[in-house]
Amino acid sequence: MQSAEKPRDLARDSVYQELRSEILMCRLRPGQMLQERDLVARLGISKSPIRDALLKLEQRGLIEVLPRKGYRVRQIDISDVRDMYGLRLILERECISLMMDTASKDVLERLDDFAEAPSSPDLPTWIDYNRAFHTYIAAHCGNARLAMIAQEIIEQFDRLTYVSVTSSDDLSLDKFEREHREIIGAIRAGDKRQAIALAG
């Protein structure tokens, strides 16, 4: 029987999830400095779990340590984006292929839930919708390790999506819905080649 999580572990995970969400949604902007004392005051929690959470964020490549200065949200580096996009493409295509080979009829039918985007014009809602669609496919690929890695990469794309949309002259988000419908249509039709091609 597994023991219950220690309070410090729970606090660390709570802080980690909060800061991770703020980074991925660009509420903490690329290049923004983070100080332990400021986070202690803002989150109302002791320094130890905050330090643990910051260490985990550094390990995930979301922040960097600046000796004697504190922590900084990592900048979005063009070469890093290119590498991440290539990795995501490989992972998502494999997830689609495996899902089409192994998923039940019910799992495939539930893809239709993503055919219509949320009515809210709120950007975070749309980003949640986009992430939920892609992580659903990953979660049902039948390979737990692949799913875990793919979902982490997909979630890290949230802030890239946020930056690309908000910096574009065209703020239309209809492309998410259109792309999802095309992928869903190909999967439901059993056209693996087309579904994989659309993932790119």
Name every feature range the model reports, one short phrase each.
Residues 13, 89, 105, 109-112, ...:
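Amphipathic alpha-helical repeat elements characteristic of tetratricopeptide repeat
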Residues 7, 164-200:
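C-terminal all-alpha effector/ligand-binding and dimerization domain
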Residues 22, 27, 117-121, 138, ...:
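Hydrophobic side-chain positions on well-ordered alpha-helices
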Residues 107-125, 180:
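Amphipathic alpha-helical segments enriched in hydrophobic/aromatic residues interleaved with Lys/Arg
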Residues 87-102, 132-170:
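Hydrophobic, amphipathic alpha-helical faces that serve as interaction scaffolds
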Residues 1-101:
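Short linear motifs at protein or domain termini
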Residues 50, 108, 112, 147-154, ...:
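Short, well-structured alpha-helical segments
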